[in-house]
Regions:
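Gram-negative outer-membrane beta-barrel transporters
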Residues: 27, 198, 452-456, 562-567, ...
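Short, acidic, small-residue-rich periplasmic hinge/interaction motif at the N-terminus
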Residues: 27-78, 119, 127
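A beta-strand signature from Gram-negative outer-membrane beta-barrel systems
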Residues: 31, 146-198, 759
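Extracytoplasmic beta-strand/coil segments of soluble accessory domains associated
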Residues: 86-134
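C-terminal beta-signal and adjacent terminal beta-strands/loops
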Residues: 132-135, 568, 665-674, 700-760
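Transmembrane beta-barrel wall of Gram-negative outer-membrane proteins
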Residues: 208-298, 325-327, 331, 394
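Surface-exposed extracellular loop regions of Gram-negative outer-membrane beta-barrel proteins
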Residues: 297, 469-471, 487-545, 562-589, ...
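Outer membrane beta-barrel strand-and-loop segments of large Gram-negative receptors
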Residues: 381-390, 434-438, 444, 534-538, ...
Length: 760
């Protein structure tokens, strides 16, 4: 009943804004010249800002075309994210926040998932360059990492736009882009002095939810001659949720687990500094040197991989238990010539030091603190990239792109390779003193040709070759077609094979986990097992297909896209033992990471944008998932809503005042079908998350030409959800923690926020 009331109230808010906007619309139609005159009176600064925006997406362009979506700096200003940009990226077609499996482990660490392919298949870029810091975090037995992901390295106020690329169009980016790409484009410097200072504060209505404070600055300008620079710094802090936020909502717990609780969302203290020096050494030629440093330290909320606890967990609530230190350095040469030929070349070095308290690696103690001592995981990533774009006017207009990349990842893990042989010795492996080092290289070549066959036909074939030093060769062909159908309709089709190489944990035989039996899929009762890295893994591949039809006229846009990803060789924990220990009274089974032969992801995306008037715009998108399953077992690949509807109604009341309402409706979320031993889920393990909606309101006032103020309310109707535990029941004679099904994350309640942006 309450949900129905909330839906009705949400619609009333939208209709209310329509009711106020309708007479405005009528007045605009009666006096269009007035609006044109007002627009002509913008000052030079405003015009300059608009020109910068037009380079990326003209005002008449829709931001949610099939396969590609764009989020602008203006949208980020009107709807500022609290924690990181994933909060607004999730409102794009095909995007949700999920874990990397159906386990529910680290359930509040949800990350960007595109078209149901999981966070590990979402490639995060900053200014076109990959970010890989999350790979420094250990991969758990079920495929989860205790990480915030890579969406928080750039403060929202420093973002010029965010490009979200889905499906076949993402295949050209190579490793890790099988689901899609999120490209975070930062604001650039100019030839004139400019600076900004921004601050963001929010206040949750419920005191058991963590609040956020953020402030940052930027400065850019000339250095003399042909040199210029850009510098920004950021400091933000989000408090951890209260340790008992889920009290009364947890799944049943007995025996030694009776006093345990699933944790809420952890907090974070984030510090960033980034600088770029640019040299325009010739017409259309530039060289950029960039350096950045970030430190992210968590504020511990009490979370463990299996939602259990010990004294170290209790003693460290609210303290730092892991710290990420990220350094990045790059040199970029961009060149252009009068012929139209352009080139982009860069070298990037990224180093992440993941310093964290030691964790257990066996059974129920996996992912729980085993010591209050810190140990380090160091990940170094080197990337060399070069591409050239060649315009060709032969038979028809073409733009040919040729490129190459070389990437090396090296890891030194002093934390995760220490599991001893509790279940007996493993043939060919040492119980202690295993090497902490692992590495892999990828060499790539790629080509893409944008061929304008006619004024209404664009055909884009592409081919990418990757050689991985461990798993070998991979070919990724692609073909995309855009065909105009008259003046208003466009048909878009694409097919591509995308791929993802195994992680350094999955290929490392020195990375060993142990279970006393509950985690062993095919082992008998009471028989334990090991899980080892596998050097013989294949790369994951996915044949991604989409067909979309789009209608566009006079600011109206409507479209529908069908997508299907035939997923092959997905890497998961093994389903059958490859052997047993060499001695001992009871033989212990040995499993490896293995390739699942086939999986399937399929769904629909729709968009509808309505220009209600010159000042009122209504944008909508919906994603409906048709399939997401392991074709061998029938198991779901992840827990995502059956459908997701995002709707935004924005009204530019005056030149300096705008308001907007947002409405998101999540469909039913179903849990995993089978437990870790392959048996059907039972009892509370089958709990679903019912459909629910989130409504937001915000308003932005440009107080002066240099100061703007945004204030708003997230989750107006206080639609909260609590984490009940992990998906599956675990335990034994000493006690049980019963499964929570899909109820594995927190949805925060009503929150008030204010953001101040200044520039000079």
């Amino acid at each position: 009943m309450n949900k129905k009331i909330n839906y009705s109230l949400a619609m009333l808010i939208n209709l209310g804004i329509y009711g106020v906007a309708a007479p405005v619309f009528a007045a605009e139609q009666a006096a269009p010249a007035t609006a044109q005159t007002a627009a002509a009176n913008n000052d030079d600064t405003q015009n300059h800002a608009e020109e910068d925006t037009l380079i990326v997406t003209a005002a008449a362009q829709n931001l949610q075309a099939p396969g590609v979506s764009t989020i602008t700096a203006e949208e980020l200003k009107k709807r500022p994210p609290a924690r990181d940009i994933s909060e607004i990226v999730r409102t794009m077609p095909g995007v949700n926040l999920t874990g990397n499996s159906t386990s529910g482990q680290r359930g509040n660490g949800r990350q960007i998932d595109i078209r149901g392919m999981g966070p590990e298949n979402t490639l995060i870029l900053i200014d076109g360059k990959p970010v890989t810091s999350r790979n420094s975090v250990r991969l758990g037995w079920r495929g989860e990492r205790d990480t915030r992901g890579d969406a928080s390295w750039v403060p929202p106020e420093m973002v010029e736009r965010i490009e979200v690329i889905r499906g076949p169009a993402a295949a050209r980016y190579g490793n890790g882009a099988a689901g899609g790409v999120v490209n975070i484009i930062t604001k650039k410097g100019t030839g004139e002095w400019h600076g900004t200072w921004n601050t963001y504060l929010n206040a949750p209505e419920h005191k058991d939810e963590g609040s956020t404070k953020r402030t940052n600055f930027s400065l850019n300008g000339p250095l003399g001659g042909d040199f210029s620079f850009r510098l920004y710094g950021n400091l933000d802090k989000t408090q951890a949720d209260a340790w008992d936020i889920n009290q009364g909502h947890q799944s049943e717990r007995t025996g030694i687990y009776a006093d345990t609780l699933p944790a809420g969302r952890e907090g974070v203290i984030n510090k960033d500094i980034n600088g770029v020096v640019r040299w325009d050494f010739a017409p259309m030629q530039s060289l950029e040197l960039e350096a950045g440093y970030s430190r992210q330290g968590n504020l511990y909320s009490g979370d463990t991989q299996n939602t259990n606890t010990n004294q170290i967990v209790k003693d460290n609530y609210g303290k730092e238990t892991n710290r990420l230190y990220r350094q990045s350095y790059s040199m970029t040469w961009n060149g252009g010539w009068d012929s139209g030929l352009t080139t982009s070349n860069w070298v990037q070095y990224e180093h992440t030091r993941n310093s964290r308290m030691r964790e257990g690696l066996a059974g129920g103690t996996e992912g729980i603190f085993s010591s209050d001592k810190f140990s380090d995981i160091d990940l170094s990533d080197v990337l060399l990239h070069s591409e050239v774009n060649i315009p060709i006017d032969f038979v028809f207009n073409q733009n040919l792109t040729l490129g190459t990349e070389w990437n090396q990842q090296k890891m030194k893990d002093l934390s995760s390779n220490g599991q001893t042989f509790m279940g007996g010795p493993i043939p060919g492996s040492n119980s202690t003193n295993r090497s902490p080092y692992s590495q892999a290289e990828i060499f790539s070549l790629f080509a893409e040709d944008n061929m304008e066959l006619t004024d209404s036909t664009m055909l884009t074939p592409g081919l990418r070759f990757d050689h991985h030093s461990i798993v070998g060769n991979n070919w990724s062909p692609s073909l995309n077609l855009s065909q105009g159908l008259g003046d208003d309709f466009t048909l878009k089709m694409g097919i591509a094979q995308a791929y993802k190489a195994p992680s350094l944990y999955q290929t490392n035989p020195n990375y060993i986990l142990y279970s006393k039996g509950q985690g062993c899929y095919a082992s008998g009762t009471g028989v334990g097992c090991y899980m080892m890295g596998n050097e013989d893994l294949k790369a994951e591949t996915s044949v991604n297909k989409e067909i979309g039809l789009e209608f566009k006229r006079d600011g109206w846009l409507a479209g529908v896209t069908w997508f299907r990803n035939d997923y092959k060789d997905k890497i998961e924990a093994g389903y059958a033992p490859i052997g047993q220990t060499s001695s001992g009274k009871t033989k212990t089974d040995i499993y490896q990471w293995e390739n699942i032969p086939k999986a399937l992801v399929e769904g629909l995306e729709g968009t509808l944008n309505v220009p209600v008037s010159n000042t009122v715009n209504w944008t909508n998108n919906i994603t409906y998932m048709l399939e997401s399953k392991n074709k061998e077992t029938g198991e779901r690949l992840s827990v995502i809503p059956e459908y997701t509807l995002n709707s935004t109604l924005s009204w530019q009341i005056r030149q300096d005042i705008s308001v907007q309402s947002t409405f998101t409706w999540y469909g039913k979320q179903q849990p995993k079908k089978y437990n870790y031993k392959g048996l059907p889920a039972t009892g509370t393990e089958t709990n679903e998350v019912s459909p629910y909606s989130i409504v937001g309101l915000s308003g932005t006032w440009d107080a002066t030409k240099n100061v703007s103020l945004t204030t708003g309310i997230d989750n107006v109707f206080d639609e909260r959800h609590w984490r009940a535990g992990n998906a599956q029941t675990t335990g034994g004679n000493a006690g049980y923690m019963y499964g929570a099904g899909a109820e594995t994350y927190n949805e925060s309640g009503r929150t008030y926020y204010v953001s101040v942006n200044t520039h000079f």
